[in-house]
Amino acid sequence: MSEKRVEKKLIHYVKKALNDYRMINTGDRVMVCLSGGKDSYTLLSLLNSIRIEGNYKFDIFAFVLDQSQPGWDDSALRGWLDDKKISYEILTRDTYSIVKEKIPAGKTYCSLCSRLRRGIIYRYAEEQGFSKIALGHHRDDLIQTLLMSVFYNGQIRSMPPKLLSDNKRHVLIRPLAYCQERDIIKYAMEQQFPLIPCNLCGSQKNLMRQRVKRLISDLAKENPKVPSNILRALSNIKPSQLMDHELWNFRELNVD
């Protein structure tokens, strides 16, 4: 697939998500969380292109959190943002030391790291008056999270495309919800984003998400529709076919 075709495909699915879930309203100030990875770069790049088109009237701002990880170098990232003329701030908070201190060696850092990062993001967004917080989770993240929740937590839940935070103060959006990771990888390579690797968790193997990712990949080899079917299931709920008493009154179910 050519460079333009990949970009066109991704923009199509981002716009579909924006419209399906009314993610962005006229006049919104959207804070895009830029981690330095391929997903957040792609999100920021596509939203910036859509903003420049002019059909959606909103402002974007890139928020970068420097967590004081060894080897962190944001010089190329700064250059990329300056070149794109995107407003940004790089905030330094040493969550790295906290995570290393609290989590035993060999254990997964992701959960605590995410909680610390989320708190900083929410606080910054509130202080600066941003109306939306945009995250770079894509289609594969959504379907993997669903299966992880089922397998390891006994819950049917995932990452919704649009979410009101628990404290009711922030609206989170995931414009890449319909985008496939393989297309994002192609786009990131073509754009030559100056990626910053995560040295905190990048070396941890056999994480739950990687196992679920392999499972989905293996199933897709037998039936390519498996990933899209899982995604479609998230918006095709049949409460009467499940076992949740809060969603369906099974006790009072009788023949009239």
Curated annotation (Swiss-Prot):
One of its GO terms (cellular component) is cytoplasm. A motif (PP-loop motif) lies at residues 35-40. Pathway: tRNA modification. Gene3D superfamilies: HUPs. [4Fe-4S] cluster binds at residues 110, 113, 201. It is an enzyme of class 2 (transferase). One of its GO terms (molecular function) is magnesium ion binding. Keywords: 4Fe-4S, ATP-binding, Cytoplasm, Iron, Iron-sulfur, Magnesium, Metal-binding, Nucleotide-binding, RNA-binding, Transferase, tRNA processing, tRNA-binding. Its EC number is 2.8.1.-. Its cofactor is Mg(2+); [4Fe-4S] cluster. Catalyzes the ATP-dependent 2-thiolation of cytidine in position 32 of tRNA, to form 2-thiocytidine (s(2)C32). The sulfur atoms are provided by the cysteine/cysteine desulfurase (IscS) system. NCBIfam families: PRK10696.1 (NF007972). Belongs to the TtcA family. The thiolation reaction likely consists of two steps: a first activation step by ATP to form an adenylated intermediate of the target base of tRNA, and a second nucleophilic substitution step of the sulfur (S) atom supplied by the hydrosulfide attached to the Fe-S cluster. This is tRNA-cytidine(32) 2-sulfurtransferase. The lineage of its organism: Bacteria, Pseudomonadati, Pseudomonadota, Gammaproteobacteria, Legionellales. The gene is ttcA.
